[in-house]
Structures are given as C-alpha cells and as structure tokens.
Amino acid sequence: MSWQNNLRSVSPYIAGEQAELTDMIKLNTNENPYPPSLQVQKVIEDFKSDNLRLYPSTDAKVLRKALATYHHLNTDQVFIGNGSDEVLSLSFLTFFNSEKPLLMPDISYSFYPIYCGLYHIPYQKIPLADDFSLSVNSYFQENGGIVIANPNAPTGMAISLQEIEEILQNNQDSIVLIDEAYIDFGGESCLPLLEKFDNLVVVQTFFKSRSLAGIRLGVAFGSAEAIAHLYDMKNSFNSYPIDSLAQKIGEASLNDETYFQKSVSKIITTRENFKKELIKLGFQVTDSKTNFVFVHHPKVDATTLFKALYEAKIIVRHWNQARISDWLRITIGTDREMNTVIQFLKEYLKNKEKSY
C-alpha cells in the first residue's frame, strides 16, 4: 500500500444531485427547462455516424468563426472548450501564475478555490457586503489576477459594465477573468470592453441559456494573444476536446436567434413572477439576473426547508457554508413547476405558523 504515499490529495467539487427518479421536480443545477431549438434537433437527426471514425477539428474552427461573427469579434479572439468548467480550469492554469494572490469574492462559484488548490495558486477571498453586493474598490490592490462571476453564483446578483471597467482600469497588469455563465438572463456582458482592455478574458457557456448542458460547450473571449496562450495550454492536455457532433450542435444553436430569445425571455418572466410570489410569502430574495433565485426565510431554517422540499420531490440547492447556510438556490423551471413549488411553500408555511 506504499503507493498511497504518492497520491495527490484533492478536495473535489461537489456537483448538484442528478436525480434518478423521473417524478422529481429538479431545480438544483440550473438547467434550462425547455428543449434545444428545432435546428439543433435537425442536426442531431441528420448527423452521419460514419463521421465518428474521424477526429474532430482540433480548434472547432467552424464554430469559432460562427461565435466570432455572432459577437462581432475576430476568430482569433475565441476559444472553445469542453464545457465552461474546462475553459475556467485552463484559464486559471494559463493566466494565474503569480506569487501574488488571485482575488475573488468570498461567496461565488465553489470551483474557483479548487482550481487554485490544484494549480498551487495563492488566492484571497474578498468579502461581499451583508446584502451580497460587490464593492469594486476592494479589488484595487496588489494581485496576481482577478476572477468574478457576473452575474454571481449562487447569489444571482450582477455588477454593471461601468464597475467592471473600473476594475480593469485599476488592474492593467493582471488578467481579469469575468465568468458570464448566466449573462443571457439579465446581466450586461462586458464583451464590448475587449476593444479597450487586452487583460480581459470573458468565459461563457452554451448549456444554461441554449439548453445544451448535455454536450459540454464552453467558450472564452479575449485578445488574440491571450487566446493563443489558452490554446497552447489546451493542446498540452488534449488536442481534441470538442467532439464533432457538439461542434455542429453549437453552430446550429447560434443560427436560431428567435428561439433563443423566446426561451430566455420566458425564463426571465417566470423568474420575476416567482420572485413576487416568494416575497408575498415572507422570503428575502436577491435581485437575481440569472435562471435561479437565491432565497432566505427569517422564520424557517434553510436545512429544514431543503429537506421538506426534497420529501415533496422538489430538489433545490443548499450549501453548508459560512454566510449562506440559511439560504437556498432554486432553479427557474417551467411555470407549472414553479407554481407547484409556491403551492407547497404556502401549505408548508401555513402549517409552520400553526405550530408556533
């Protein structure tokens, strides 16, 4: 058993539960409740299986060009990876190689400190305010890089384009990575700032707003130089991370803008209606610009409520983590699913009142 002495110990990321029961209302991993566009479905139906014997494009050239056109960028400003988690991982490894600490909010995507541990990146967590807002002035200090999810997860809150520009202006010797995984649901993308700042890297994903969680497509945008370094790092690990079908599906999803906008708009409308109903029930709800809400009830322990929802076959997300252990994150599903949640909460809180 001496081989165990040479193991590299890690504390892995704990993903949201993937429920095996089909009658569960799954609102814990921020998946889109609606199917991909018909154009995506047609690509899948028309895909020739014989193509699977060939390696895919190493840099997803056609999809890169489509994304560049969609966002009015040059192709060499686009990087594509196997899901945004891979893109983030490679970005941390590529850009954050300083003895100075990487700055990040204390409440944010829990993969960030895991990457830092894996790659021996020193980091410093900057506390959010009591209302979970972010103070840009806190990032005007010496650092080896900055990573901010905007909108943030799990709080759902966003900072403005002007605030991001202030951070960039005050940190021109560091890479500022903005994780825009949820940007399509109401945040303001900082992609226009790429024209002014070569130290900006923006990461996005296909799975949340385009209903493509199952194919794993993530993307980074930056200066041509930054993206070239990112590809150098990628090619040191895996030359072919994006399979042929995924590349075609990604391209098709960009070609159906009407469906995309309709799907996103529907989720936003459902979210706002759901927030209003939660507030009526006494919940505190953050100003979410994502496809989820972050909620707290002053009279109900979050762990207890999480278990009660689970027993009612409704799965949401809870973290036993400092400052947010009494909060729940609830993905926005269909109107019917969210109405079911509201009806359960009404009954649950009514019974709770009787027991006081």
Curated annotation (Swiss-Prot):
Q: What is its EC number?
A: 2.6.1.9
Q: Which residues form a coiled coil?
A: none
UniProt keywords, alphabetically: Amino-acid biosynthesis, Aminotransferase, Histidine biosynthesis, Pyridoxal phosphate, Transferase
Q: Which cofactor does it need?
A: pyridoxal 5'-phosphate
State the Gene Ontology terms under molecular function: histidinol-phosphate transaminase activity; pyridoxal phosphate binding
What reaction does this catalyse?
Answer: L-histidinol phosphate + 2-oxoglutarate = 3-(imidazol-4-yl)-2-oxopropyl phosphate + L-glutamate
What positions are modified (N6-(pyridoxal phosphate)lysine)? Answer: 208
EC class: transferase
Q: Which pathway or pathways does this protein act in?
A: Amino-acid biosynthesis; L-histidine biosynthesis; L-histidine from 5-phospho-alpha-D-ribose 1-diphosphate: step 7/9
One Pfam family hit = Aminotran_1_2
> Which InterPro entries does the entry mention?
Aminotransferase_I/II_large (IPR004839), HisP_aminotrans (IPR005861), HistidinolP_aminotransfase (IPR050106), PyrdxlP-dep_Trfase (IPR015424), PyrdxlP-dep_Trfase_major (IPR015421), PyrdxlP-dep_Trfase_small (IPR015422)
The alphabetized list of GO BP terms reads: L-histidine biosynthetic process
Q: Which HAMAP family match?
A: HisC_aminotrans_2
Similarity comment: family membership: Belongs to the class-II pyridoxal-phosphate-dependent aminotransferase family. Histidinol-phosphate aminotransferase subfamily.
Q: Which NCBIfam families match?
A: hisC
Subunit note: Homodimer.
Name the chain's protein.
Answer: Histidinol-phosphate aminotransferase
Provide the taxonomic classification: Bacteria, Bacillati, Bacillota, Bacilli, Lactobacillales
Question: Gene for this protein?
Answer: hisC
